[in-house]
Amino acid sequence: MNKFCLLPFHGKRIGVANIPFTILFKKGPYFLHSHITAVYYSTKGKNDSHEQSRVSKKSTFTPLETPWYLRIVDNEKELMEGKKNNHHTMNKELEIPKTSPNSLRKIADLLTGKLGLDDFLVFDLRKKSPNSVSAVNKLGDFMVICTARSTKHCHKSFLELNKFLKHEFCSSAYVEGNFNERQESRRKRRLARKSNLSKLLGRSSECSAKDLNSEAWYMIDCRVDGIFVNILTQRRRNELNLEELYAPENEKSKFQNIDSGNVPTISGVNEISSNNNILLGLRRLAQQRRRYSTINPNGLSNLRYFLQKEDFKGANKIIQSSSGTETHNIRTLEHVKNTLKDLVGQERKVDVVQWKSLFDEHSTFLTINQSAAYWPLRLEYAILLNKADPQFYSDRVFLKDYLLLKKSLGQELIREDLIALLEMVLKTQHSSHSYFNLVKQNRVIIRALNLFKGLQTEDDGSVVYDEVVISLLLNSMVADERVKLRSLYETIDHIFQTFGDKLTSGMIVSILQNLAKIKDWNKLLQVWEAITPTEGEGQDKRPWNEFINVINQSGDSHVISKIVNNGHLLWIRRLNVNVTPELCNSIKALLKTAGMENSTLEEFLVRGTNNQ
């Protein structure tokens, strides 16, 4: 039987021993060992030295190793020193492109030092050949790729990086791939409703929800010096192989996966089909130059279904559930516009108030900033609203809802904007063609023209002096034979003084038509003779065909006889006018109305010209 033995201590001596001490259990007797030899103090005389030496020999033992709980602090110190050494080594090996901004160095130190991200790579996208330009080249200058240990590590790294950017550069990062708890729970519910995960995720059916949640890819736009940061888990990084996408042409071979079977994937399948190859899809996006929509086709069909039924609550839910980037919002608004265009083309009665509210609700400031795509879309949408209900969406509403809004947001008005307003003014119907209603319309035009002061066209001319604009302005000054603005004649005289011999055919035709509409034939002939070239100037290029048609359509026999008998038509031969088949038909119709069909004058004007 094993015995437990203790060292003998003498009763007349006081012993003090330092702790700790241990009890060693062996097959033999149990002994109590102390690290330090015990020191004793005695009150005896000379015999104390002999007794003390005897006890000291018995109390001297072999020292043991330092216990684990005393080695914890030392181990932590060694670990911290090792991390510091590794960090210094990593900083030495960290390759940053030359002439890169200091912000890139600070971000790199944060990612590799404090956040502990591995496999740090930086690609300089500033100098690329035109043949290898992708969408990322136009967005950023530096592409950073690094590896995290888990999805939580990715998320934590993004949060710390965002805090760092706000503190150091006063910039807020934009991230793709960051799923919050609500989105993640919604994602899990959708996966639970799907029996075939491969159709939903584009991966092998062996993939599970656990595998999906264990991998992550955060793409972060730092909004500082064109720096983009990609934080991926190791498996996702191996699968995507973004290095091959962003590397220069002469270095792509370094990052190519020679044996795809050795690359770990989420599904664990060695063979990757072309439909499931994410890198192949990224290559296509980089090489092609087309506008790409991220809207789900099913979502588009559902949105169209609700819009055709004018169920705006359901349409709002679909748009809000699929909200994304500014380009995505432009696509959605364009789809709304196309649906309204189809309904208006079918002459269906639509709720213009709800359609306008739907478009305005989803026209955010970020979407409006996409001026190249947004404002032409809004202009076309406004024209459709006016066509659907001119009384509700009138010219005055268009002036405030489009022209003033666009001008107040710092956007430049263009020629098409003014033309759209003038066309709406002409379409607006009033209960009676009175002079006061015409004045009201003219006030809207005056307010609009004040917004276009100083604007130039592509030909360095004023927008107001555009040929189409002048024609529409003249048409807006005349309602019928009895109602016209008093400024009509002043406007015509101003046009003649401004353009002189450079009057275009469109301007001349518009002046003739409006004078014929008010039946002011004397002013019409005065204008026509004022632009008559002399015989030495060459061929007459006035719009003779339109002039004769205006006279013939008036149906006034007195005016027609005056044109024929006073010799106005003889100028066609005198000035070598190019007699086209259309002009021949117009001359015959005019002479037939005047009762001079098959006359000598017709033979002289038409047949004589044909013989030449």
UniProtKB/Swiss-Prot annotation:
Keyword field contains Mitochondrion: yes
Domain of life: Eukaryota
Role, per record: mRNA stabilization factor specific for the 0.95 kb OLI1 mRNA. Also involved in OLI1 ring formation.
SUPFAM superfamilies: Nucleotidyltransferase
Family to which this protein belongs: Belongs to the ATP25 family.
Originating organism: Saccharomyces cerevisiae (strain ATCC 204508 / S288c)
Keywords: Membrane, Mitochondrion, Mitochondrion inner membrane, Transit peptide
GO process terms (BP): mitochondrial gene expression; mitochondrial proton-transporting ATP synthase complex assembly; mRNA stabilization
Membrane topology (UniProt): Peripheral membrane protein
Organism phylogeny: Eukaryota, Fungi, Dikarya, Ascomycota, Saccharomycotina
Gene3D superfamilies: Beta Polymerase, domain 2
Location in the cell: Mitochondrion inner membrane
Keyword Transit peptide: yes
GO cellular component, one term: mitochondrial inner membrane
Protein name: ATPase synthesis protein 25, mitochondrial
First and last residues of the transit peptide: 1-14
Recorded coiled-coil stretches: none
Primary gene name: ATP25
Note: Present with 2430 molecules/cell in log phase SD medium.
